[in-house]
Curated annotation (Swiss-Prot):
GTP binds at residues 34-41, 61-65, 79-82, 146-149, 178-180. InterPro entries: G_ENGB_dom, GTP-bd, GTP-bd_ribosome_bio_YsxC, P-loop_NTPase. Signal peptide: none annotated. Pfam families: MMR_HSR1. Its cofactor is Mg(2+). Keywords: Cell cycle, Cell division, GTP-binding, Magnesium, Metal-binding, Nucleotide-binding, Septation. It comes from Streptococcus pneumoniae (strain CGSP14). This is Probable GTP-binding protein EngB.
Length: 197
């Protein structure tokens, strides 16, 4: 599907804890998942050419609800709570887990998940679990490796290979190196997203 999007026409629509609060229409949605402080808010702001549409926080674990971003009345980003944040109670983490699982497995509007990992580090057990979960439920996935600007370009391949190996990456999925500082990977990310709509 080819879609002309005015990405400047974007706003946060609503925050939801369960399906009774989800938007009630048929706009396609792309969910964004990743561990706390992987750069999800920076990814959203970069992709939508905004400084602080999604609030970046020095405190991980800030997003506790599903945040729906309306983009040009044609599609939505859905920011899901960052996982793997230790200073949240086990009970709270389980609640988030159920909320995320309910959204990912029952939402008909969902077209794909952008799974964000930090290019500098091996994927965490949570990253691997998320990828396996998406593959198990046959949910299309785009891996975006953030913070590419923090690593010399000559080492990108090495880090990419390490991540792919740890994830047991399916080569039919998209893998994009991304930097919210230099905007590297932004066009590739949009191409991959629009292809899924």
């Amino acid at each position: 599907m080819t879609m002309e999007l005015n990405t400047h026409n974007a706003e946060i629509l609503l925050s939801a804890a369960n399906k009774s609060h989800y938007p009630q229409d048929e706009l396609p949605e792309i969910a964004l998942a990743g561990r706390s402080n992987v750069g999800k808010s920076s990814f959203i702001n970069t992709m939508l050419n905004r400084k602080n549409l999604a609030r970046t926080s020095g405190k991980p674990g800030k997003t506790q609800l599903l945040n729906f971003f309306n983009i040009d009345d044609k599609m939505r980003f859905v920011d899901v709570p960052g996982y793997g944040y230790a200073r949240v109670s086990k009970k709270e983490r389980e609640k988030w887990g159920r909320m995320i699982e309910e959204y990912l497995t029952t939402r008909e509007n969902l077209r794909a998940v952008v799974s964000l990992v930090d290019l500098r580090h091996d994927p965490s057990a949570d990253d691997v679990q998320m990828y396996e979960f998406l593959k198990y439920y046959e949910i299309p996935v785009i891996i975006v490796a953030t913070k590419a600007d923090k690593i010399p370009r000559g080492k990108w391949n090495k880090h990419e290979s390490a991540i792919k190996k740890k994830l047991n990456f399916d080569p039919s999925d998209d893998f994009i190196l991304f930097s919210s500082v230099s905007k590297a990977g932004m066009d590739e990310a949009w191409d991959a997203i629009l292809e899924k709509l």
